[in-house]
């Protein structure tokens, strides 16, 4: 990945997509086949029990996986199937860190996994797509 592509993906994932801006999601690091995406939990990202809503965890993991693919192939990337396991909870103010990895890239399908941890390294969720 060139430095120019890295800068473009960092800017796009942080400022240009309305969903990421609205949900305070930011792309913080990129390597070939890997993307790190972060979110500090705000009140609107919580469920009725005061912990991260499953939807925000899924979105964060999916964005990390999709961005990881974009580091290798600069084409539209859509999720066709995904499975997530929710392992632990995090509350208001916690920083969630999703690291997406490309496991295999074919001509038309890519297979990825993403782990979400909090700022202490506690594993909160895993996604396979």
Regions found by a protein language model. Name each.
Residues 1-129:
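Terminal targeting signals and extreme-terminal segments of soluble enzymes
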């Amino acid at each position: 990945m060139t430095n120019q592509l890295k800068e473009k993906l960092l800017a796009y994932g942080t400022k240009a997509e309305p969903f990421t801006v609205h949900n305070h999601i930011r792309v913080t690091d990129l390597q070939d086949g890997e993307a790190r995406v972060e979110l500090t939990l705000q009140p609107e990202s919580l469920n009725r029990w005061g912990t991260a809503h499953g939807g925000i965890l899924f979105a964060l993991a999916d964005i990390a996986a999709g961005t990881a693919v974009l580091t290798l192939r600069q084409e539209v990337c859509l999720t066709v199937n995904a499975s997530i396991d929710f392992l632990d909870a995090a509350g208001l103010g916690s920083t969630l860190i999703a690291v997406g990895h490309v496991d295999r890239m074919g001509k038309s399908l890519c297979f990825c996994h993403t782990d979400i941890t909090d700022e202490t390294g506690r594993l909160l969720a895993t996604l396979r797509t």
